[in-house]
């Protein structure tokens, strides 16, 4: 199993996670509603195709022998998704809230979940939940779009399912190349020169202070 360092954006999120440990501050969550009778077998296939083609959703975190946080990519293994039944919008909102406010066990466990649900009418959808260390709000939107595109392709029996594999390892490698390049040294020199004198911090007056000054 190959271990990789966190990228610089991930390190920032990891520090936030440590400060707000045990909370859902880094949980990104969204719901996809399908305005039609849902074929959940096909939806499961579409989700598994997405997971196979996007290794960032197979990232797991661990601590190495020195206690440093590392990441690794779990091999793809087809997943089974249980479908939850909801009676109405209130139950759906409660389910969304429960999922969105539940923190991840960030070391060792999967950093995402996808929860299909069915409404009494036969319509339904799925709730996507991911840790910010592997995704952002834009990613969540792309996840929904890719899964639904694949879902429609399978339903329509398209001969070719347009699914383009992407790898976070490419980004890790590109960041490492930059950090070991002359360009990085040049950029570092520039910014160190810019901040030889640390600028004063800007302060936003509180509402209480503003009210006191105006009275």
Tell where the protein language model's regions lie, with residue ranges.
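Acyl activation and transfer enzymes in specialized metabolism, enriched
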Residues: 35-58, 128-145
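Short amphipathic alpha-helices and their capping loops
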Residues: 1-21, 44-90, 95, 110, ...
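Active-site-proximal acidic secondary-structure segment that organizes catalysis
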Residues: 3-5, 9, 117-169
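Conserved hydrophobic/aromatic beta-strand scaffold that supports enzyme active sites
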Residues: 29-33, 142, 190
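A general secondary-structure signal for short beta-strands and their flanking turns/coil
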Residues: 25-27, 109, 123
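Short amphipathic alpha-helical segments
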Residues: 26-32, 79-82, 131
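Short catalytic/binding micro-motifs of nucleotide second-messenger systems
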Residues: 58, 99-106
């Amino acid at each position: 199993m190959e271990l990789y360092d966190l990228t610089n954006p991930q390190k920032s999120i990891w520090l936030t996670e440590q400060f707000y440990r045990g909370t859902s501050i880094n949980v990104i969550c969204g719901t996809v509603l399908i305005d039609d009778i849902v074929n959940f077998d096909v939806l499961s296939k579409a989700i598994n195709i997405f997971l196979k083609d996007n290794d960032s959703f197979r990232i797991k975190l661990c601590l190495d022998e020195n206690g440093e946080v590392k990441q690794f990519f779990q091999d793809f293994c087809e997943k089974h998704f249980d479908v939850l039944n909801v009676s109405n919008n209130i139950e759906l909102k409660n389910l969304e809230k429960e999922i969105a406010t539940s923190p991840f066990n960030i070391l060792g466990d999967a950093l995402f979940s996808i929860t299909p649900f069915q409404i009494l009418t036969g319509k339904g959808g799925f709730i996507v939940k991911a840790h910010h260390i592997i995704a952002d709000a834009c990613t969540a939107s792309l996840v929904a779009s890719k899964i639904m595109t694949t879902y429609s392709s399978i339903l329509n029996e398209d001969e070719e399912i347009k699914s383009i594999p992407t790898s976070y390892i490419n980004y890790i490698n590109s960041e490492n190349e930059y950090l070991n390049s002359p360009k990085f040294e040049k950029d570092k020199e520039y910014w160190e020169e810019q901040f030889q004198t640390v600028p004063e911090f800007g302060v936003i007056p509180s509402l209480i202070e503003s009210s006191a000054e105006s009275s």
